[in-house]
Amino acid sequence: MNNKEIVAKALHDVLNEELTMDQIEQLLENPKSVDHGDVAFPAFSLAKIYRKAPQQIAAELAEKIDGTNFEKIEVVGPYLNFFMNKEAVSQAVIGEVVKEKNNYGNSTFGNNGNVPIDMSSPNIAKPISMGHLRSTVIGNSIAFILEKIGYQPIRINHLGDWGTQFGKLIVAYKKWGSEEAVRQQPINELLRLYVQFHEEAEEKPELEDEARAWFKKLEEGDQEANELWKWFRSESLKEFDKIYSMLEVEFDSYNGEAFYNDKMDEIVTLLEEKHLLTENQGAEIVDLTEYNLNPALIRKSDGATLYITRDLAAALYRKRTYDFAKSLYVVGNEQSNHFKQLKAVLKELGFDWSDDMEHIPFGLITQGGKKLSTRKGKIVLLEEVLNEAVTLAGNQINEKNPDLANREEVAKQVGVGAVIFHDLKNDRLNNFDFVLDEVVRFEGETGPYVQYTHARAMSILRKANFTPDATQRYALNDKDSWEVVKLLQKFPETVMQAAEKYEPSVIAKHSIHLAQAFNKYYAHVRILDEDAQKEARLALVYAVATVLKEDLRLLGLHAPEEM
């Protein structure tokens, strides 16, 4: 139970059912100053019920409430200020973390419901840029968070592996490419060929016709075209996997656009049967006027299907395959109209499960306030940024701890973790500025700061040779530990809040606040002093290390034990 639940129950016991537990909890406030207690209840809402002044109601309630869980209850005007019993609360919180370990904060809320998460989704034959970072790490973190509250996440990398660009690539490869060059540097070479095609096509527009012809062959199942396409795809995936393994992101499915080639006819047939298709300048559309949306373009005048047709097929496939409780699409803000159309068309088809589909949009990464897309005219490659971050982290670790045994491994965990953490600590919908030197700093609100705090806690536990005992009573009642205990207590509701809002930043901010509170505690309290409270203090350190590690895991970061 958190402090608000404890207070709500105490009030509910004396309020004769006038308000439900939930209603009371909604009214409770966190006082701005510690002088006003840990939880405050404003009695205004009871004035009408009791036909008395709020001040009088507050005073009468204070007399009736069972004070077992409180050090004191103060009446200040119309407010009841509750000061929690630090010993009782700290014993309960530390005891629960010691007992549950990394399962602290787990719940069965999700009831094992499947949740496909459409995330990352780069285009084949193009490099993974910093622009792909957000979808990848936000999706991965949401998956961990949902798993913690009892859902079964399914990470789907909906690859951009189909389209007219493959006709261009085949032409370019046959004219100017070599197998060896593609094998050595798949993405760089395929991108070079793609760029060369566009440069040459300016002088020779007939190349565009050749590309269209090759894409038509590919669509018709031509053996040579199909083998080249498969090869471009598999070589690209090898390159992508290097980056995914750096980020330690694993996917359950790589079903991309091509996977749905044979599944779109059914969608068109369903739309026809429901008489939802209307002709517009030779193209076929679904009118979405009643949803205040532009029409959804299903099929072009040349019979080619469009992106939304593929997404409709994918949505139907995912429902049939996973029977999802919810289905998430972690895709940038600019796609919001597309997803509104997607859900509206499914609704028109009578698929009410479309209500369980959600677009999880996010803002842009910027540099100096401008969209981060190019550096010296080139795409900012994610792999280069991650490698640079690892180097910077390694340099700092060498300065702080040159004798560290597994320096390279820790540098990777800290450097890559720093980039992920910086993304996730920002509210998902906000744009944010990216300056690598600041991201990898060991001070301030950074991933390395939280990781370093965890390593510090582990170092104290090693020095004391401390292992907590779940049968022991670990209680503290000092002011310094209380701030730490309150943040530990808040962790389960933080996880729930992050899950409800699909907002990893809630977890990142909790980790920062807990690290800050613990470092303050470390500075003020002699943890290893031999006295009656030593074991309880060490149990608190253990609880901090456990919860920080879990905070970091939910964000997709490691928690090194030494740094």
Swiss-Prot record:
Gene Ontology molecular function: any one: ATP binding
Class of this enzyme: ligase
Keywords attached to this entry: Aminoacyl-tRNA synthetase, ATP-binding, Cytoplasm, Ligase, Nucleotide-binding, Protein biosynthesis
Pfam families: Arg_tRNA_synt_N (PF03485), DALR_1 (PF05746), tRNA-synt_1d (PF00750)
EC number: 6.1.1.19
Coiled coil: none
A GO CC term attached to the entry: cytoplasm
Chief location bin: cytoplasm
Cell compartments where the protein resides: Cytoplasm
Sequence motif: 'HIGH' region, positions: 122-132
Gene3D superfamilies: Arginyl tRNA synthetase N-terminal domain (3.30.1360.70), HUPs (3.40.50.620), Isoleucyl-tRNA Synthetase, Domain 1 (1.10.730.10)
The reaction(s) this protein catalyses: tRNA(Arg) + L-arginine + ATP = L-arginyl-tRNA(Arg) + AMP + diphosphate
Subunit-level organization: Monomer.
Family that this chain belongs to: Belongs to the class-I aminoacyl-tRNA synthetase family.
PANTHER family attached to this UniProt entry: ARGININE--TRNA LIGASE, CYTOPLASMIC, ARGINYL-TRNA SYNTHETASE
Full protein name: Arginine--tRNA ligase
Organism: Enterococcus faecalis (strain ATCC 700802 / V583)
Gene for this chain: argS
